Each structure stands twice: as structure tokens, then as C-alpha cells.
Amino acid sequence: MIDKKEVGMNPVCAEKEDMKVEKSKVYFTSMKTSFSENLPQKLERLMKTAGIGSIDFKNKYAAIKIHFGEPGNLAFLRPNYAAVVVKVVKELGGKAFLTDCNTLYVGGRKNALDHMDAAYQNGFSPFSTGCHVIIAD
């Protein structure tokens, strides 16, 4: 079951008269799985429940912003989850690609070439995700 929770907007925005403030719907699910549904399948179901199908992706580029992780660290979503998002966007007619911006600090993501190397080292490649990596340098 996918649960829904209403979350309020930033109160500063609510003070502006010319802005219509609506509550955002936030969707979440348990990380527990069963024999009939694994985590990538749950992610796909969550995206569809949240309404990704109502977005017009037909022949449009779709930047999927993701943190590729620093080389040697594990604090990033794995490529198999990115592949699920890419698959759904492509099924809806979109031209998906993964992207992230470089860092200001010195490290493995300080420029586009090193950043792409970091992404590939952490498993983000066209073969594992189904789309290209483009660094917004």
C-alpha cells in the first residue's frame, strides 16, 4: 500500500498575496518487500501512484537530477533505482538523461570529466541505467 501525507508549503510564500499556495502531496512507502514485489518494482508503482503518467514527456528531454556519489563512498541511490525512473520516463515517450552539477569543493566531482568518471565508477552508465550521463558544468 502506498501512503499519502499532506505537507504544508513554506509559510513565507503564503504571505505573498499574488501566490496561490497549495499543499503538496508527498508519497512514501515502506522499504519492506515481499516475494511478489522488490524495491525497484515498488519504486515504479510509487511513481505511477504519484501521477507521473499525467506528465507530458512525449518527445521531450527529461533531466533526472541525481547525486552520483563521491568515489569510494556509499551515500547515494544505486543505479538500479535510476534505471527504474529512466524506464518509466521512456515508456511515457521522454528522452531521459541523468544529470548533476559539479561541486565547489575539491573532490571527485569538481569538474565535468572527473564527475563523469565518479558516476561511472559508482555504476551510473548507459548500460546500467538505460540513458546517458550529462554533467551540468
Feature locations, PLM:
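N-terminal and secondary-structure boundary signal
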Residues: 2-137
